[in-house]
Every structure is written in structure tokens, then in C-alpha cells.
Amino acid sequence: MIGRIAGVLLEKNPPHLLVDCNGVGYEVDVPMSTFYNLPSTGERVVLLTQMIVREDAHLLYGFGTAEERSTFRELLKISGIGARMALAVLSGMSVHELAQTVTMQDAARLTRVPGIGKKTAERLLLELKGKIGADLGAMAGAASASDHASDILNALLALGYSEKEALAAVKNVPAGTGVSEGIKLALKALSKG
């Protein structure tokens, strides 16, 4: 599976990207939240990815943050929610807005996302209750542990650690720690664990 992609951004046509990785062009679909934060074409881009293999296609979905990818994966576990619908949800609201919506059980807010009706919204709320909030709570704890938590987390993911291991390690990094020192502290915590 392809879990991360780094290369030169060749094309941007919402929500599709073409990323050149050493001469190989990868087509990647991204949520609009990631799309709006992309660099200009011709510049280097790094995306966390989720590869989906279907009978008729191999599809690659890209995300700017680990929490977006984790939420995408949770959405895919829900019956009747495919990759396109999950991408639409993440394009229609941020991960934190989705977590608030799930916590408040606000089906009306979810129905504003194109393609989601009342029944689908209710199923999403039921299935995500207790899952998405727990993930975000862990990530919020990691983010408060360091000003550079996202960069440290992405570095650990790039080194092959699981999201769970990386989040636990980032929690041990004191606030105000720089990225390189934070990575060292996180790696030290991982080696002890």
C-alpha cells in the first residue's frame, strides 16, 4: 500500500492532483480542505495517502494531516459510505466540525454536505459516535503537547510508525519544543515503549 507520497505538484484540478515522484506521475484525489492548502504547481508537496483497490481501479486519496486520513478511514468503515462520499464529507466540513457535529448529534448540519440525506446523516452520527471524538481527543492532546506536534507526528508516520504509536509519543513532547528536538524526544519515548 502507498501510505505517503512526496514529489512535485504538476497539476491541480479540484479535487484531482498529479504528483510527479521521480518520473512517475500519481493521480491523487484530495478533500477541498487539503486542496486549499496545497503549494503552487511546480513546487514540492507531501501527502499522507490511502490507497483503495477496486476490481476496476486502483485509487489514491491524499490528505494534508494524519487526522484527516484517520477520519477518512473511519468514514469508510460505515456501511453505504464509499470513498467519494467520505471525500465529500471532508470537503464539506473540517475534521473538528465533523467531531462537533457527531458530539451534538446534529443531523441537519450533515445534510448540508452534497449527497448526504437525512437517513445517511443519522447512520453517520450513530456509527461515528464514540469513535471520531476519541481520535480527535487524542490528537488534541498531542497538539497541545507541542507547538510543532503536527510536523513531529508526520515525521514519525513517515518513519513507519503507526498513528497510534506516533500520537502516544507526541504526547510526551513538552510545549514549545522545536521540531527536530521534538522528533528526538518522541523517538526516545518510542524506543522505551
Curated annotation (Swiss-Prot):
Record-linked Gene3D superfamilies: 5' to 3' exonuclease, C-terminal subdomain (1.10.150.20), DNA helicase RuvA subunit, C-terminal domain (1.10.8.10), Nucleic acid-binding proteins (2.40.50.140)
Gene Ontology terms describing biological process: DNA recombination; DNA repair
GO CC list: cytoplasm; Holliday junction helicase complex; Holliday junction resolvase complex
UniProt keyword terms in alphabetical order: Cytoplasm, DNA damage, DNA recombination, DNA repair, DNA-binding
Region of interest (Flexible linker), ranges: 139-143
Record InterPro entries: DNA_helicase_Holl-junc_RuvA_I, Hlx-hairpin-Hlx_DNA-bd_motif, NA-bd_OB-fold, RuvA, RuvA_2-like, RuvA_C, RuvA_C_sf
Renumbered residue ranges of the record's region Domain II: 65-139
Subcellular localization: Cytoplasm
Region (Domain III) residue spans: 144-193
Primary localisation category: cytoplasm
Origin: domain of life: Bacteria
GO terms, molecular function: ATP binding; four-way junction DNA binding; four-way junction helicase activity
Similarity field: Belongs to the RuvA family.
Subunit structure comment from the entry: Homotetramer. Forms an RuvA(8)-RuvB(12)-Holliday junction (HJ) complex. HJ DNA is sandwiched between 2 RuvA tetramers; dsDNA enters through RuvA and exits via RuvB. An RuvB hexamer assembles on each DNA strand where it exits the tetramer. Each RuvB hexamer is contacted by two RuvA subunits (via domain III) on 2 adjacent RuvB subunits; this complex drives branch migration. In the full resolvosome a probable DNA-RuvA(4)-RuvB(12)-RuvC(2) complex forms which resolves the HJ.
Biological role stated in the UniProt entry: The RuvA-RuvB-RuvC complex processes Holliday junction (HJ) DNA during genetic recombination and DNA repair, while the RuvA-RuvB complex plays an important role in the rescue of blocked DNA replication forks via replication fork reversal (RFR). RuvA specifically binds to HJ cruciform DNA, conferring on it an open structure. The RuvB hexamer acts as an ATP-dependent pump, pulling dsDNA into and through the RuvAB complex. HJ branch migration allows RuvC to scan DNA until it finds its consensus sequence, where it cleaves and resolves the cruciform DNA.
Comment block on domains: Has three domains with a flexible linker between the domains II and III and assumes an 'L' shape. Domain III is highly mobile and contacts RuvB.
Name under which the protein is recorded: Holliday junction branch migration complex subunit RuvA
UniProt lineage: Bacteria, Pseudomonadati, Pseudomonadota, Betaproteobacteria, Burkholderiales
Gene: ruvA
